[in-house]
Amino acid sequence: MSGSIKRALLFLCPFVMGAPPCMAWDHEWTVVTVTRTGSWGVASDSVQPQAIAKAIQRCRAMAGPANDCGAQIMAAKGDWMVANLCGDHKIIASGSSLLDAEREALNREISLQLFYVPDLPTCKRVVTVDPTGAIVPSNQQYSNAREAGQ
């Protein structure tokens, strides 16, 4: 057998022998960006820079010409993401479950309040994104960091 045929067989063998199928989020980047005014953009793509560009473009379409779309982004693969707005302070967090993402956002909110903004306004959920990149209606609208910190 020639060397090229051997290499081809070695390359194809794992695919033929029953490698598990890829899930959509195994190779899709999901990006979230939020502005200080609450406008946001979400996009998914197999290439991270493309997902970033699409999310910023969608944010700008929502926000209008004067905005800070792209100033703060989060990119993840297969994670839940939540974006909260606390006055004009943005918090974007991710986690393997919705509860983990919400917990991470709450931890960031508490840290922000303890170390940088003692009079941090109550946070409001701006957008929730599931592991496939779909936007999910949120039933949690306001944070409870003030109660958790007491």
Where do the protein language model's features map onto the residues?
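Bacterial N-terminal signal peptides
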Residues: 8-19
